[in-house]
Amino acid sequence: MTFRYSNIAHTLFISIMCLFSIPLCFSLSIFFFLSSHSLSFAIHCYAPLSTSLHCGWPHKVDMQYFFPWSRILRPTWVGRALLSKGGVIEMLGGEAGMLGK
């Protein structure tokens, strides 16, 4: 039951983000697939969109050279909320906000 609802939540989240950025949608779709549909794991992966990606690995992988998140997200109001200090993702326990300072 939980799996089904988390799958629906993922689909809605990715669909909404598709409205703002096709590259972001593609990237999130990959993370969604790799996260094995686990909502809490996926939120932890999606959260640090600004400077690094930390998905339960023992070290942080710096993704800013591969995915210019700030250039993709900042023009949209959703992006500003995600990247701002104290934004939506930070409230979910993420590490976003480094570029939003």
Curated annotation (Swiss-Prot):
Q: Which domain of life is it from?
A: Eukaryota
- GO CC, one annotated term: membrane
Report TM segments: 13-33
Quote the subcellular location field of this record. Membrane
Provide the membrane topology annotation.
Single-pass membrane protein
**Which of UniProt's keywords are assigned here?**
Membrane, Transmembrane, Transmembrane helix
Q: What is this protein called?
A: Putative uncharacterized protein C32H8.15
Organism of origin is Schizosaccharomyces pombe (strain 972 / ATCC 24843)
For this protein's source organism, the top of the classification is: Eukaryota, Fungi, Dikarya, Ascomycota, Taphrinomycotina
